[in-house]
Regions:
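Basic, Lys/Arg-enriched alpha-helical interface segments
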Residues: 1-62
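Enriched for short, Lys/Arg-rich terminal
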Residues: 67, 71-104
Length: 104
Protein backbone atom coordinates (compact mmCIF):
# COMPACT_ATOMS: atom_id res chain seq x y z
CA UNK A 1 0.00 0.00 0.00
CA UNK A 2 1.38 3.38 -0.99
CA UNK A 3 0.88 5.96 1.72
CA UNK A 4 0.28 9.64 1.25
CA UNK A 5 3.14 12.00 1.99
CA UNK A 6 2.76 15.04 4.22
CA UNK A 7 5.71 17.43 4.11
CA UNK A 8 5.83 19.83 7.02
CA UNK A 9 6.58 23.49 6.24
CA UNK A 10 9.96 23.26 8.02
CA UNK A 11 10.94 20.30 5.82
CA UNK A 12 9.93 22.24 2.72
CA UNK A 13 12.01 25.19 3.92
CA UNK A 14 14.93 22.81 4.57
CA UNK A 15 14.75 21.54 1.00
CA UNK A 16 14.65 25.08 -0.40
CA UNK A 17 17.63 26.15 1.73
CA UNK A 18 19.75 23.14 0.78
CA UNK A 19 18.86 23.55 -2.89
CA UNK A 20 19.93 27.22 -2.77
CA UNK A 21 23.16 26.37 -0.94
CA UNK A 22 24.14 23.71 -3.50
CA UNK A 23 23.03 25.91 -6.44
CA UNK A 24 25.47 28.67 -5.44
CA UNK A 25 28.30 26.45 -6.67
CA UNK A 26 26.62 23.98 -9.01
CA UNK A 27 23.10 24.35 -10.40
CA UNK A 28 23.18 20.90 -12.02
CA UNK A 29 24.02 19.28 -8.68
CA UNK A 30 21.23 21.27 -7.00
CA UNK A 31 18.71 20.02 -9.56
CA UNK A 32 19.94 16.45 -9.08
CA UNK A 33 19.61 16.90 -5.30
CA UNK A 34 16.04 18.18 -5.64
CA UNK A 35 15.03 15.30 -7.94
CA UNK A 36 16.78 12.73 -5.71
CA UNK A 37 14.97 14.09 -2.64
CA UNK A 38 11.59 13.79 -4.37
CA UNK A 39 12.46 10.27 -5.54
CA UNK A 40 13.57 9.23 -2.03
CA UNK A 41 10.38 10.61 -0.48
CA UNK A 42 8.32 8.72 -3.08
CA UNK A 43 10.19 5.57 -2.12
CA UNK A 44 9.19 6.14 1.52
CA UNK A 45 5.53 6.17 0.49
CA UNK A 46 5.94 2.64 -0.87
CA UNK A 47 8.34 1.27 1.76
CA UNK A 48 8.05 3.32 4.98
CA UNK A 49 10.20 0.90 6.99
CA UNK A 50 13.22 1.42 4.74
CA UNK A 51 14.69 4.13 6.98
CA UNK A 52 16.49 3.61 10.28
CA UNK A 53 15.10 4.61 13.67
CA UNK A 54 16.76 7.72 15.10
CA UNK A 55 18.79 6.64 18.14
CA UNK A 56 17.61 9.25 20.63
CA UNK A 57 14.99 8.67 23.32
CA UNK A 58 13.60 12.20 23.00
CA UNK A 59 12.88 11.54 19.31
CA UNK A 60 11.00 8.26 19.71
CA UNK A 61 9.33 7.06 16.54
CA UNK A 62 11.38 9.31 14.27
CA UNK A 63 13.11 7.57 11.37
CA UNK A 64 15.75 8.77 8.91
CA UNK A 65 16.76 7.94 5.38
CA UNK A 66 19.59 9.39 3.30
CA UNK A 67 18.68 11.11 0.06
CA UNK A 68 19.68 8.76 -2.77
CA UNK A 69 23.07 9.88 -4.10
CA UNK A 70 23.42 12.55 -1.39
CA UNK A 71 24.19 10.44 1.67
CA UNK A 72 24.96 13.40 3.93
CA UNK A 73 21.43 14.76 3.47
CA UNK A 74 18.84 13.01 5.62
CA UNK A 75 15.07 12.89 5.51
CA UNK A 76 13.55 12.62 8.99
CA UNK A 77 10.03 11.25 9.09
CA UNK A 78 7.30 9.61 11.14
CA UNK A 79 5.28 6.66 9.91
CA UNK A 80 1.56 7.11 10.53
CA UNK A 81 -1.26 4.67 9.74
CA UNK A 82 -2.26 6.32 6.47
CA UNK A 83 0.60 8.64 5.66
CA UNK A 84 4.28 9.48 5.99
CA UNK A 85 4.99 12.68 7.92
CA UNK A 86 8.21 14.29 6.62
CA UNK A 87 9.43 16.32 9.60
CA UNK A 88 12.77 17.75 8.42
CA UNK A 89 15.34 17.38 5.63
CA UNK A 90 18.75 18.17 7.09
CA UNK A 91 22.45 17.75 6.47
CA UNK A 92 23.90 14.95 8.61
CA UNK A 93 26.23 17.39 10.37
CA UNK A 94 23.27 19.23 11.93
CA UNK A 95 22.33 18.52 15.56
CA UNK A 96 18.80 17.17 15.16
CA UNK A 97 17.90 16.83 18.87
CA UNK A 98 18.80 20.47 19.48
CA UNK A 99 16.89 21.59 16.39
CA UNK A 100 13.77 19.64 17.39
CA UNK A 101 13.98 20.79 21.03
CA UNK A 102 14.17 24.43 19.93
CA UNK A 103 10.94 24.02 17.94
CA UNK A 104 8.90 22.74 20.87
Amino acid sequence: MTRQIVIRPKASDDLDEQFAYIAKDNMDAALRFFDATRETISQLAKMPGIGSPVQNSSLAGLRKLAVKGFNKHLIFYLTQDNYIDVVRILHAARDLPTIIDSEE
